[in-house]
């Protein structure tokens, strides 16, 4: 393997989400969110009891955002992208089919999903479950469909979900049952020999083609961005890429900086099979699938990410710290320049932790390891089970995210809301406790709730206590604590080396000197030296990545973060 020479050193101060530091803003608590989105994810009707939602699509219609996702038994609507109302749906017989898509056309919302025999439904008032079937004349079998309406009101239909077949597209006539106009065109072929991120496997290591799927089209400044997902929904490296062209049916060219939506690191990974949309203020967002995939390949959640669409640097979603608290703007924001993070650091990672009880293999240490694929489980689901974290010293706590794991449950759809009741208390000495969060009378199904404190709490100890007898185990993927740790900021990362594999140019290996006083590291990369559009969190001092383009030149940098600062100003940039 060939060691790469250092090209240039740069200084950059960054925020959590975007690439520039923002001034402090006053944000109402109900506009502060994190990922995964806190929804009443439905338990599935068969196999091991687990929740699922994936393959989301979202459109703004008559003053509300409507979001549909696979296997959810209904859909959600929101006025602000922060608070969501669930609408159960029984009038769409194909609601259980995978990968839904929706279209705003005139004063009506249209719906369809994956099917060998396409059936389309419409509703002018989707706040009510009153959908009607369209006399559909679209005759091609399809999976992972997507509608796109152009500025001239012409409508196009895209689909594709295969490790062999291409992404397809055709114009349709919505006034004539969505009859196809002309013959479908093959738009995106498989190219895993050139594009490492299309290769399947946890680390893109399997010697076969992945699945190209989940198309979506965005038009920006007269150009058409045809998005697609790869290589498989069960992987953290599941992402969305772009081809771009001047016409809705191509020809399209591959965007070198792909994938544009990508999140292999952090508490929860995955950012694929998504949908890019514009909010009512003109801001772009990407809603996508995130993976757990332990009890079933399709055990998934949804994530929401801000998107930059830059004339110079292309399109890229800001995902790295999108599972830390951030705020939903109520105005137009330049995500390339303005940071929407709350600036709260993770305080709970691998701190001393204890519990009332635990099952073997589900120890309390798994509840603050920043891995959604592992969890703590108490021996029972009885009231009185608890989990406690010692932060090591008194720190300022701003928010706590509770991520329930539903372990040993026997819940299957259809089911009543699964409601947790609990409280969280804090202490400076482990003896005298103050209640910070009271959910003892909670009636909402909120498995990933972010509790933002009205007044920051200065505590060393935090304890969550179950107050409701439940089946199975009281269990948590992670209890995540955010705030200000105080102390020294991280030093500059030293010894950073990037090596490209001589036999497979899609593979890079990175090493650097371990640093003291750090929580983790941020690896950044891109195909343009002045703008590294991708980044991920790494906790060790070495990393192998196989998701690069074979024929592209890349630039890299490495920085560190801790409980005091999430991005340091020293970054070293390397070229290959």
Regions inferred by a protein language model and the residue ranges of each:
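Short S/T/G- and acidic-enriched coil/turn segments that sit immediately N-terminal to beta-strands
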Residues: 241, 420, 449-451, 539-544
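Predominantly extracellular/luminal regions of secreted and cell-surface proteins
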Residues: 168-180, 334-370
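Beta-strand-rich modules
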Residues: 545-566
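Beta-rich carbohydrate-recognition and catalytic domains
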Residues: 21-207, 219-225, 229-266, 281-283, ...
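Extracellular low-complexity, O-glycosylation-prone stalks/linkers
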Residues: 425-426, 514-540
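Hydrophobic core positions of the immunoglobulin-like beta-sandwich fold
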Residues: 389, 452-453, 512, 543-547
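Pro/Thr/Ser/Gly-rich low-complexity, intrinsically disordered linker/stalk tracts
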Residues: 482-517, 550, 564-576
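Aromatic, loop-rich ligand-recognition surfaces of beta-strand-rich domains
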Residues: 369-437, 447-495
């Amino acid at each position: 393997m060939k060691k790469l020479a250092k090209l240039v050193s740069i200084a950059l101060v960054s925020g959590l989400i975007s690439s520039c530091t923002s001034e402090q803003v006053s944000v109402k608590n109900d506009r502060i969110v994190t990922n995964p989105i806190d929804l009443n994810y439905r338990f599935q009707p068969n196999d091991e009891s687990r929740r699922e939602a994936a393959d989301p699509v979202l459109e703004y219609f008559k003053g509300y955002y409507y979001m549909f996702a696979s296997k959810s038994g209904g859909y959600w609507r929101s006025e602000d992208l922060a608070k969501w109302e669930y609408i159960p749906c029984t009038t769409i017989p194909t609601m259980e089919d995978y990968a839904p898509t929706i279209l705003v056309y005139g004063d009506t919302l249209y719906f369809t999903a994956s099917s060998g025999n396409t059936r389309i439904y419409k509703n002018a008032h989707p706040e009510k479950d009153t959908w009607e079937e369209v006399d559909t004349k679209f005759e091609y079998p399809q999976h992972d469909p997507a509608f796109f309406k152009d500025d001239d009101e012409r409508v196009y239909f895209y689909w594709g979900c295969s490790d062999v077949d291409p992404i397809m597209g055709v114009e349709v006539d919505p006034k004539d049952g969505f009859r196809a106009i002309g013959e479908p065109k093959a738009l995106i072929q498989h190219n895993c020999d050139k594009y490492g991120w299309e290769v399947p496997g946890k680390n893109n290591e399997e010697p076969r083609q992945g699945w190209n799927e989940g198309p979506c089209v965005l038009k920006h400044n007269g150009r058409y961005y045809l998005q697609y997902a790869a290589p498989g929904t069960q992987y953290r490296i599941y992402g969305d890429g772009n081809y771009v062209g001047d016409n809705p049916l191509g020809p399209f060219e591959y965007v070198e900086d792909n994938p544009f939506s990508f999140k292999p690191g952090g508490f929860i990974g995955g950012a694929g099979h998504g949908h890019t949309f514009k909010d009512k203020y003109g801001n772009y967002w990407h809603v996508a699938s995130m993976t757990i995939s332990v009890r079933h390949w399709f055990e998934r959640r949804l994530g929401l990410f801000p998107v930059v669409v830059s004339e110079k640097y292309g399109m890229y979603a800001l995902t790295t710290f999108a599972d830390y608290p951030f705020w939903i703007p109520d105005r137009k924001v330049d995500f390339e320049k303005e940071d929407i993070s709350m600036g709260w650091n993770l305080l709970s990672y691998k701190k001393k932790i204890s519990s009332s009880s635990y099952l073997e293999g589900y120890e309390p240490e798994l509840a603050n390891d920043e891995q959604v694929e592992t969890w703590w489980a108490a021996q029972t689901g009885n009231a009185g089970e608890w989990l406690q974290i010692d932060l090591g010293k008194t720190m300022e706590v701003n928010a706590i995210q509770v991520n329930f794991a539903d372990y040993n449950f026997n819940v299957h759809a259809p089911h009543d809301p699964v409601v947790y009741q609990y409280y969280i208390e804090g202490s400076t000495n482990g003896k005298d406790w103050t209640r910070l969060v009271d959910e003892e009378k909670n009636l909402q199904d909120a498995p990933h709730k972010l509790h933002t404190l009205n007044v920051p709490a200065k505590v060393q100890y935090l304890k969550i206590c179950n107050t409701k007898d439940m089946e199975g185990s009281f269990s948590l993927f992670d209890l995540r604590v955010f705030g200000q740790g105080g102390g020294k900021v991280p030093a500059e990362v030293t010894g950073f080396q990037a090596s490209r594999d001589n036999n497979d140019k899609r593979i890079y290996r990175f090493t650097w000197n371990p640093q003291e006083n750090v929580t983790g590291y941020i690896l950044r990369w891109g195909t343009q030296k002045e703008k590294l559009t991708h980044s991920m969190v790494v906790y060790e001092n070495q990393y192998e990545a196989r998701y690069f383009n074979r024929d592209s030149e890349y630039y890299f940098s490495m920085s560190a973060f801790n409980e005091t600062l999430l991005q340091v100003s020293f970054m070293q940039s390397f070229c290959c």
